Amino acid sequence: FYSFLELEHLYDSAIELVKTQLNIFDNEFSMRFQRNPIHNIESRIKTPQSIVGKLQRKGMPVTPESARNNLTDIAGVRVICCYIDDIYAIADLLTDHSAFQLRKIKDYIKNPKPNGYRSFHMILDVPVYMSNGKEIAPVEIQIRTIAMDFWASLEHQLHYKSTGDPKIAASLTGELKECSETISGIDQKMQDMFKKINLL
């Protein structure tokens, strides 16, 4: 029934719907509160090669239907927010949206990964209305602050470059976790300063 091209169109459409709704929220905040909680929105769709590789690793049939039924991270949206409170505000708005169905939440801000990674993850089932009817596509959404995104981007680069030397990799692991703690503290300070300014 599905080709990989049709699959890509479905998930691309779901991403556009989520991004449109995020921009509506952001513009409303700008109008009502004179500020934008969202700094940036990024998105991506897994390539057919990446989808095939993941299905093979999971020992599942390598077909578009199998990908549709078994993978929830084909479509991804990353929302970069200004403050920690903005993350939860955006997550709540998406969760409460009547068109979207919440499938899963993982809060790596309150419960960081062992390596120091912090972000708020959620999977939403997004309805896409095609010419032949409604289709549901899961979209993985990562919401994080500018500081969290800075750490995650550099951690990925450093980890990738250090894999050839186990000693350097082990040393970097500890240092990166320390950096994560420092950045988390800065995030909280910025949040506190923002709250003080709002009380003026």
Language-model-derived ranges and their functions:
Residues 1-71, 184, 194-199:
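Charge-rich, low-complexity segments
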Residues 73-77:
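Short amphipathic alpha-helical segments
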